[in-house]
Amino acid sequence: MERRFFESQKGDRAAKTGYFGASRRPRALRFGLPEVLANHMGSPTMYTAHTVQQRGLTLELDDPPSPCDIAPEDHSKDGTGIGQVWQAATDLLCDWLESHAQWVKEQGRSLELGAGVGVPGMLVAKMGAEVTITDYHPRVVSRLRANVALNGLDPLASVALLDWGEPTSDFQRYRLVFGADLAFAQRCAAQCAARVRELCDGIFLYAHQERHAIFMGPDGQVQREATDSGLDSLLEAASPLECRQLCERDLPEGERVVLLALGAPAALAALPSTSTA
């Protein structure tokens, strides 16, 4: 399946900015990293919409489901990554969800964590399944509601504010919880896992682009973390849930993105068969 992002606003001027691309060195230097450290960063890890002149993006998928329209927002001066698309992991998650649409619908209303623009959650709704799409940032939640309305997905898709550091008493338990690239730091990974244990009554489907932190050692030499500490923290905090890798996809420069399923042994055993992507 081919998935392409393109600018839906007509006109050459808009089309020039309506693409998804990677910004590696410029973004690194914008965070104030020394140039020697920026030069050692791996392949692009975050794909962001160039939104200075953006008027709307359409996510083109196989039919069904039909395309998803993304409401515009200007992140050009925002270096936080909040509400942006982490494309490699999102692609893998969407591919699996679409390939197992019947199983997804059988799980009842599902829950997306850390949704950003909400592409996987809207895909689930366009497949005819109920889903609650969540994020912790009010601005992102507002944009999610706009995206759901833009695509006419109410009432299949609902949007809610969910802060992983706060109680979740307003939420039910879900047989399917999913998300992409949520374990980008140890603290948030542990908080995410705690919410998964509270809210998941079946399978947590998690797509993750493996990352190894680059840092400056005491001797001034650039060093690379031996393990993916964010993912390690999530898996440790999710215990006693067991983990099974469903598929993986190679990325440039030796990196990869993996799709993991976390759950009790019985829930993992009931998953549909899958193969390496």
Feature names for model-found ranges:
Residues M1-A277:
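S-adenosylmethionine-dependent methyltransferases
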